[in-house]
Every structure is written in C-alpha cells, then in structure tokens.
Amino acid sequence: MSESLVAYFSASGSTRKVAQRLAKVAGADLFEIVPERPYTAADLDWTDRNSRSTRERDPKCRPAVASTCDNMADYDTVYVGFPIWWYVAPTIVNTFLEAYDLSGKRVVPFANSGGSRMGATVAALKPSAPGATFAAGDVLNGVSDAKLEAFVRASA
C-alpha cells in the first residue's frame, strides 16, 4: 500500500494520461473520479451557455461521483488531478473531496489546460477539504518524467 494516492477526473483522457504517469513517478495508488452520469461531447461544449459543463460552473453544484475510494484513511498525500474549466476545477472535484475526512492530509492539486493556469483553483477547492493542507499545485501539460519527479519533490 502506498502512502500517496493520485485521484483524477478526466473528461477527455488528457488528465488520465498525466495522472497515470504521476502515479508511477510518485509510487502512488491511482483512483479515477468517475461521474455517475458520463459526460458527452455536447456536455463539454464550453461555447454553449446551456451545456452541462457550463451549468456546473455554479459553485454550489455537486455532480454525483459513481464510486468512492474505500481506503482513503490509508493515505497521507492525495494528489488531485483535473482539467481546468473556467479557471477552476470542475465541481465534481469538490464532490470528491467533500466525500472524505481529509483532515491532516496533504492535498496536491494538478491540472491540465489548453491555456489557463491554476488561477483561483486552490482557493476554490480548500473549503471542500477543511483541515487538509493544500500545496500550490501546478498545470502539468506535456511534462517530462523529470518535471513530474520535481513536482513530487516540491509538493512533499
């Protein structure tokens, strides 16, 4: 059993690839945050003001997650990965964090994005994990294993 977990939400598969590599580099277990209702291409159309992803921008929105990590208590560090949607994490990440008591754990956000940085992401996630310590996190687009190793060291 690893002391670290890499949990990730990936709508298109891009975050999944980074999460798998990060888990390998960090020697961490891997958990996919799967929505109870899968996203379609239409759901992800950010140009449509009525698309699901646009409606879920509401900070109070909590999309349901299909499964839980049964052994969260075993981990000291939880890396949480996601795409950046409108400068923050998708609200399903808040749903995931709120499902656990993360007090005393280190939460390390990581993201990928077509052009956004972390922005207000960490500030928006902190209320969902009271008592956890948050690292600054980073956007990990197309990074090398050496960069992932440096990210893990910097997040320790």
Language model features: what each stretch is:
Residues 1-80, 87-89, 94, 98, ...:
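N-terminal beta1-alpha1-beta2 submodule of the flavodoxin-like/Rossmannoid cofactor-binding fold
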Residues 32, 109, 136-139:
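Structural signal for conserved beta-strand scaffold positions within catalytic alpha/beta enzyme cores
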Residues 80-81, 109:
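Redox-cofactor binding/interface segments in oxidoreductases and associated redox assembly factors
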Residues 103-106, 131-132:
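A short helix->loop->beta-strand "cap" motif at the edges of active sites that frequently abuts
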Residues 111-116:
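Short beta-alpha junction loops
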Residues 120-129:
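Short, aromatic/basic amphipathic alpha-helical patches
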Residues 133-156:
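Glycine-rich phosphate/pyrophosphate-binding loop and the adjoining helix
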